[in-house]
Amino acid sequence: MQIYPLRFVPNKINFDFMNFKKVSYSFSIILSLISLIWIGIYKFNFGIDFVGGIVIEVRLDRAPDLPKMRAVLSALGIGEVVLQNFESEHDLSIRFGSSSEENLMKNIDIIKTSLRNNFPYNFEYRKVDFVGPQVGRHLIEAGAMAMLFSFLAIMVYIGVRFEWYFGFGILIALVHDVILALGFMSITKLDFNLSTIAAVLTIIGYSVNDSVVIYDRIRENLRKYHKKNITEIINLSINETLSRTILTVITTLLANLALILFGGKAIHSFSVLVFFGIIAGTYSSIFISAPILTIFANRKFNKKVIER
């Protein structure tokens, strides 16, 4: 039995992506500026990982219904509430932010009353701690360093595998994706917490993967078509990898959609941000990182690009 490959576009498709180069550049610059301006004015909706808050440790007589408990506590109107087990399924950590110290005891009483009225458990409150914002500043610095090191590692990898100007194209695309992701997070008021930093790093990885696939085909076509100019080669390479790109983005979005619908509040911000980032990363790999190579069209491509 013969197996045919799954394709979403015709084999001989020849869509002129490069014809939209100036439009895509202008569109991306406008979106990036809007994102930066919005972030500058409205900032982020920082979660308790960054602004500090209260940590309540409680032991229950049996395993709690965490999804229901999250829903009940989130409806209290005291901001983000994070619940998670530690040590055992009977031990629960409840974390929430507080706008002022005056509200601390009031919010603690609200939570205790809500738990007592809505759940038939025996609660043993073992510890109540205040987590200051200085911890949040440390986490912000750690997150920024994580993104910086990921950029540097990617640049080294691309420089070794291709050439430095390929790395330049990917760097521009990554900066574009991160700015749009942060702008989207600010506009939609998604919680800025440790999971959203993980989401940004996931977006970076996805965008690089998409761009490397196209770059690899560009390098291969440079070997095959010596008489074609760089614009034709880039167009050809994007079209040849288009079916793979569409298949990858659809399957990844569907998997991520399941997380958005069924993953619960704990990973909601992560899932929504990754969903947006996958779309942005796919766009940037086609319309930004590849067309940027035409900047070097008037230069002779290094032999190492063709020989590798």
UniProtKB/Swiss-Prot annotation:
Is Lipid biosynthesis given among the entry's keywords?
no
Q: What is its main location?
A: membrane
Q: Which GO terms describe its cellular component?
A: plasma membrane
What is the membrane topology listed in the Swiss-Prot or TrEMBL record? Multi-pass membrane protein
On subunit structure and binding partners, the annotation says: Forms a complex with SecD. Part of the essential Sec protein translocation apparatus which comprises SecA, SecYEG and auxiliary proteins SecDF-YajC and YidC.
Q: Function, please?
A: Part of the Sec protein translocase complex. Interacts with the SecYEG preprotein conducting channel. SecDF uses the proton motive force (PMF) to complete protein translocation after the ATP-dependent function of SecA.
Cellular location(s): Cell inner membrane
Superkingdom of origin: Bacteria
Q: Name one GO biological process term.
A: protein targeting
Q: Which GO terms describe its molecular function?
A: protein-transporting ATPase activity
This chain is encoded by the gene named: secF
Q: What InterPro entries does the record tag this protein with?
A: SecD/SecF_arch_bac, SecD/SecF_bac, SecD/SecF_CS, SecD_SecF_C, SecD_SecF_C_bact, SecF_bac
Family that this chain belongs to = Belongs to the SecD/SecF family. SecF subfamily.
| UniProt-recorded name of the protein | Protein translocase subunit SecF
Q: Look up and give the organism this protein is from.
A: Rickettsia typhi (strain ATCC VR-144 / Wilmington)
One Pfam match: Sec_GG
State the UniProt keywords alphabetically. Answer: Cell inner membrane, Cell membrane, Membrane, Protein transport, Translocation, Transmembrane, Transmembrane helix, Transport
Record Gene3D superfamilies? Multidrug efflux transporter AcrB transmembrane domain
